[in-house]
């Protein structure tokens, strides 16, 4: 009876309002963000201000290339003392350790890669009130050290609101807060803010031109960047931890059996492997090894293989066993290490017809079928060991028993979308992967 009277977490979120953060809580947030050894200072950030947003009058957007879980600290500090409302993933509002802060500093929820009417309502209200809004048009943090293409419709979105847009370029944040390891690896982070668009710029440019320009300025590879910067990151001798979730395929023998231990990434079948040091150098175990120079290049190699395989085989299919998790109905998630609560298991399959799951949820039969027109990539907030999808507006986490399935499923989804729909287009820097296909740019 008690639960019938109590609002669900989703109902509470859907009934929320957002306003300017109270000075008291904003001051506390500022204090926390500057605490040494705990928050931003321990990552040794360097801030460079080309155009000071604090001189801007009226509402504005601040966008940034989303590199890591810690980006909010660097955005907070480079924009200060100006107050703002940050946009964060809807599922993050279900976590107890984040929810209290989100409520105090007035964070706006947004469901990743799907329509969200609550978000539009809250955003419109705050812009009318003259607020500064910070968000990443990529929709989630970097998965393997490079930027993702921005969410389709970003150009139209910015033109619609017609307010100035500032850009914060981050470098080193991915290597600091790596996707394969939930423990931070402090080194150095660089943040630079500049004005990207004035109101007049947005009026003059087409949505397509805006998106092309943002994708261009966002193009960045933290691994390539550090080959020149040569910054040492504190990997604790575990630089390869869980890296098999993304680097799953051996570049030498082609087997999808890569294993990782501490700072070693290796194929158990042919012995091909490497060690990874604190500079994220991939060092072959011996002269016979065939090793990409970074994780980003490794994934690029795997993407090229997937592009060929799905075009070659009209009956292509990939399946794996997994658990699934969802959000508790009446409680927030208390365990910081979990993005959901396990509620069932089954088989996840990807083929030319879409994404499919058959199994159980809360003890009952459960299945879904999704089109690549709707799902073009995965939500991957915390780590690369799991991923999430929205089913009827509700986040469902997929937890493969073999985490090597994550990286492969991600690439299959993205490239099946491009093969069959191509709304979320690839970036120009990987044009060469599509040579000889229908997506080759002549």
What are these regions (language model features)?
Residues 12-35:
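Helix-enriched interaction subdomains in cytosolic or periplasmic regions
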Residues 210-225:
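Short, structured interface segments
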Residues 231, 236-290:
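Cys/His-rich short segments
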Residues 352, 359-393:
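Low-complexity, glycine/alanine/valine/leucine- and proline-rich hydrophobic stretches
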């Amino acid at each position: 009876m008690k639960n019938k009277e109590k609002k669900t977490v989703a109902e509470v979120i859907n009934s929320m309002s957002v306003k300017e953060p109270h000075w008291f809580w904003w001051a506390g947030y500022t204090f926390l963000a500057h605490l040494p050894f705990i928050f931003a200072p321990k990552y040794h950030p360097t801030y460079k201000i080309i155009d000071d947003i604090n001189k801007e009058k009226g509402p504005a957007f601040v966008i940034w290339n989303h590199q890591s879980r810690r980006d909010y600290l660097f955005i907070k500090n480079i924009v200060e003392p100006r107050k703002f409302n940050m946009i964060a993933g809807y599922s993050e509002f279900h976590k107890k350790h984040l929810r209290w802060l989100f409520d105090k500093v007035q964070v706006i929820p947004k469901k990743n890669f799907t329509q969200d009417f609550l978000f539009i309502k809250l955003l419109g209200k705050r812009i009318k009130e003259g607020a500064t809004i910070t968000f990443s048009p990529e929709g989630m943090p970097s998965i393997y050290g490079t930027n993702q293409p921005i969410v389709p419709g970003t150009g139209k979105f910015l033109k619609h609101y017609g307010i100035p847009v500032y850009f914060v370029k981050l470098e080193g944040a991915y290597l600091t807060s790596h996707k394969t390891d939930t423990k931070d690896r402090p080194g150095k982070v660089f943040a630079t803010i500049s004005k990207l668009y004035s109101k007049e710029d947005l009026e003059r440019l087409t949505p397509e031109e805006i998106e092309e320009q943002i994708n261009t300025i966002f193009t960045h590879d933290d691994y390539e960047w550090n080959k020149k910067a040569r910054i040492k990151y504190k990997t604790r001798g575990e630089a390869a931890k869980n890296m098999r979730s993304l680097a799953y395929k051996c570049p030498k023998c082609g087997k999808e059996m890569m294993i990782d231990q501490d700072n070693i990434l290796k194929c158990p079948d042919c012995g091909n492997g490497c060690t990874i040091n604190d500079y994220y150098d991939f060092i072959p175990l011996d002269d016979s090894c065939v090793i990409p120079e970074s994780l980003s290049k490794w994934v690029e190699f795997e993407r090229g293989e997937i592009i060929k395989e799905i075009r070659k085989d009209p009956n292509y299919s990939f399946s794996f066993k997994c658990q699934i998790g969802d959000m508790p109905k009446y409680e927030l998630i208390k365990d910081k290490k979990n993005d959901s609560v396990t509620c069932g298991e089954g088989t996840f399959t990807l083929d030319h017809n879409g994404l499919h799951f058959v199994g159980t949820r809360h003890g009952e039969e459960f299945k879904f079928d999704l089109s690549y027109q709707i799902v073009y990539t995965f939500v991957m907030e915390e780590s690369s060991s799991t991923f999430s999808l929205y089913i009827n507006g509700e986040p469902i986490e997929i937890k493969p028993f073999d985490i090597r399935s994550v990286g492969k499923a991600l690439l299959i989804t993205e490239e099946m979308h491009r093969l069959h729909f191509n709304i979320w287009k690839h970036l120009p820097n990987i044009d060469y992967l599509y040579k000889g296909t229908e997506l080759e740019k002549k």
